[in-house]
A protein has these predicted regions:
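Glycine-rich anion/phosphate-binding loops
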Residues: 80-94, 115-118
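Active-site-adjacent structural elements that line small-molecule/cofactor binding pockets in enzymes
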Residues: 88, 132-206
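Active-site mouth loops of central-metabolism enzymes
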Residues: 13-31, 74-86, 137-153
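Acidic (Asp/Glu)-rich catalytic clusters
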Residues: 5-9, 34-41, 60-71, 92-100, ...
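Alpha-helix-loop-beta-strand connector modules within alpha/beta enzyme cores
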Residues: 53-77, 118-139, 181-200
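N-terminal amphipathic alpha-helix/helix-capping segment at the start of soluble metabolic enzymes
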Residues: 1-16, 23, 67
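Glycine-rich, proline-tolerant flexible connector loops at the mouths of alpha/beta enzymes
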Residues: 21, 42-61, 108-117, 167-186
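Hydrophobic faces of well-ordered beta-strands that scaffold small-molecule active sites
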Residues: 12-20, 43-47, 74-78, 103-105, ...
Length: 206
């Protein structure tokens, strides 16, 4: 991994994604991983975010420690599927007040119901833009979103997020570099001219 990243570092920027730890052992693994990956100089690192205040608080705590103890740029994930508009506005204000300037804006996983979501990622981007001048990343899917009926639908959905004010897109994980490069070219054809950063999920145990 180190060798491959060094080979492409001049052409393609990468980001790393981490999960908030649930146990002391997982927390030790997390910080060991961050220490080992920091010399690779990713564009930024992101920390996932789940439903419930406990996970959200852990995400915020990890972000604050990364900001304090490392030179890495850190970005929390924020999802809109399980929170109302006023709650999201308050979360965004709290992040801004604590010095967080970069947020990864996501819809989030749908619950097990037929009810359509009241907000999508593009709506969340607009909401964040209304709160403060955040640096906003959104998700991209080089191999296609599982809910998209076709690749063009998926691509136009990404364009809506960019048009709403996102600064860049982070790809979901992929196993074929050619699929990423083709996707990046297709983005240009529909007028998406922001960075499409390959996301990397570090394997911390196996």
């Amino acid at each position: 991994l180190n060798r491959r990243l060094s080979e492409i570092s001049n052409d393609i920027q990468v980001s790393f994604e981490f999960f908030p730890p649930n146990t002391p052992e997982m927390e030790t693994t997390l910080w060991n991983s961050i220490e080992r990956l920091a010399p690779l100089k990713p564009s930024f690192v992101s920390v996932t975010y789940g439903a419930g205040s406990g996970t959200r608080d852990r995400t915020h705590d990890i972000i604050k420690r990364i900001q304090k103890d490392t030179a890495l740029l850190a970005a929390p994930h924020l999802t809109c599927i399980d929170a109302g508009r006023e709650e999201l506005i308050q979360i965004a204000k709290d992040y801004w007040a604590s010095g967080v300037r970069h947020i990864v804006a996501l819809r989030g996983d749908l619950p097990n119901s037929d009810e359509k979501p009241s907000m999508y990622a593009s709506d969340l981007v607009e909401l964040l833009r209304s709160v403060a001048d955040f640096d906003i990343s959104v998700a991209a899917y080089p191999e296609g979103h599982p809910e998209a009926p076709n690749p063009q639908f998926d691509l136009l959905n990404l364009k809506r997020k960019i048009d709403a004010g996102a600064n860049r897109a982070i790809s979901q994980f992929f196993f074929d570099i050619e699929s990423y490069l083709r996707f990046r070219d297709r983005c240009v054809t529909v007028g998406i001219d922001v960075e499409i950063i390959p996301g990397i999920l570090p394997v911390t145990n196996y």
